[in-house]
Amino acid sequence: MSNYDKEIPPEKAELVDRRAFLEVAAGAVAGAAVSGAIPEIAAAQNSGSDRGSGPLYMQTNEIQNAIIHYRRDGGGALTEVERVLTGGAGSGTFKPISGQASAPNAFEGAGSVILSPNRQLLFTTNGGDNSVSSFRVGKDGRLTHADVKPTGNPVKGKSGTAKSLAYAPSKGILFVVHSFGPDHVRLMSVDAQGTLGMRPERYTVNTQEKTDRVPTMGVLSPNGKFLLVGTTFDQSIAHTGLYPDGSPILWVPQPDGKYRVIASNAPDPDGLVLFPVQDDGTLGGAKFQDAKAASPFYIAFLNGRPDAFVIGYAVGNGCAMATIDSDGKINVGPLVKIDTSPGLPSELCWLSISPDDRTVYATDFGYSYISSYHINGSGLKIAKDPACPKVPGDGTARGLNTTVTSGPSDCWITADGAYLYQIYGNASALVGYATRSDGSLHEINRVKIPYNSPQGLTGF
């Protein structure tokens, strides 16, 4: 009998020790740090005199959704420049992924606000009504609304779930990922002016046996040949229900009477989903690959190594280095776990990689702080855990580990690696940090943002 299929009498299900079980789930691969010398971070990251300025963009995800445009000065401080309506609807404080009336991280996703590589267009999802908006970006970073179009997926219930974007400019195609399927991935056409067009193609990350999977984000490989999609649940927590204490049910009965954790890739080797990108921008058949640990939430390619990427695991509680070859075969290295003493799972869900590919910053939703890794050759090593003090929320939000959280979600690092910005939704705060060569973060700026709803960060 598999460790993941232990028989549990239904009357005992509510007494399950979730920490013990999630330790099993997280152990789909044993974590191991790769030792070796850590090179010093470039001096540009430590000197304030040559740090540049630029725009930073975040979506409010309010019912009347808007993009907030901040101006980042040479010292990293943020000043709000404008709020531009998207023409679409967000989910507000409602969290569709769990059905909670008010909670941070509405969609369990990443990459909801992105820029085109030439920085002339900005795209954002509108999760409330399943639409996408485009903007033209001026030389000063100011936004001009270009278009808004539905993704093609109908809204069921109180909100849609469009949440992650990837853009292939050479093909004029935008890939849109939704939390709920079966049509998880939809395509939209884009022209040079940002005009959007709905397309009929639709793709799923479900399998024949798993018909309620929840993907997290879509990322194009640097060569544009593959769309990689991360996953977090094999069954949505909005559909599994709650324990009497209000925490989500993470173990569900199977037809054979056994119970299984709903975290993806725990242990079935199918948590990473790869779609070949065809010449016309449409996708080939899905290939399900082993992520080697539970809930491979975030995928971040290195800046200088187009065949290498880092995976952040929400239930695996750590990160791993991975490579992809020209045929799309993925090889995942050892999992390097963070300290999980605050509770399991950590919900390590978002990553930012420094431009010199030496440091990874990992956002821990369940712990209300950020951890950091150093990239050492082909592996990872913990740098600072935590890398910054915990940011408290208002006490109303809890992670899957039942601990109170401020709900940190998307983060973004500047092109010079000098500053990192982090959303703490339940604290109504966007926090700016100065990076340090040892992997630690020093808070330099904090601005008030809408409560619980904001998501998505990008800039230049």
Where are the regions that the model predicts?
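Short, conserved, GDST-rich strand-edge loop motifs in beta-rich repeat architectures
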Residues: 54, 230-266
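C-terminal segment of N-terminal export signals and the immediately downstream linker at the start
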Residues: 15, 36-53, 57
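Beta-propeller fold detector
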Residues: 79-88, 144-152, 197-206, 284-291, ...
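N-terminal secretory signal peptides
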Residues: 1-20, 27-35
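Short loop/turn segments immediately following beta-strands, especially the blade-tip
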Residues: 71-77, 136-142, 187-196, 275-282, ...
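Beta-rich, blade/repeat-based domains predominating
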Residues: 51, 88-115, 152-170, 206-226, ...
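Short loop/turn segments immediately following the C-termini of beta-strands
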Residues: 61-62, 72, 127, 179-180, ...
